[in-house]
Amino acid sequence: MLKLLDIVTLKNDDPETGAKAGTEGTIVDVLGNGKAFTVEFFDEDGNTIEASLYTEYTSAQLQKVETALTLT
């Protein structure tokens, strides 16, 4: 299950944003109780791919790389 601040990669190219499969990003918003996610993806230089912030991704489009740390 994906959650806020998880590190993910994109499974397939996203022609709308220019992000390629394997591009790494961070989940910055969880929508509809986990039905969709806003992800901040980064290019090779570490810059935000801004168009990704206006795109909703489903869990089927994302692969979790690292689970967000939780503070107790």
Task: Give residue spans per PLM region.
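Basic/aromatic-rich interaction segments and small domains that mediate binding to polyanionic partners
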Residues: 3-63, 70-71
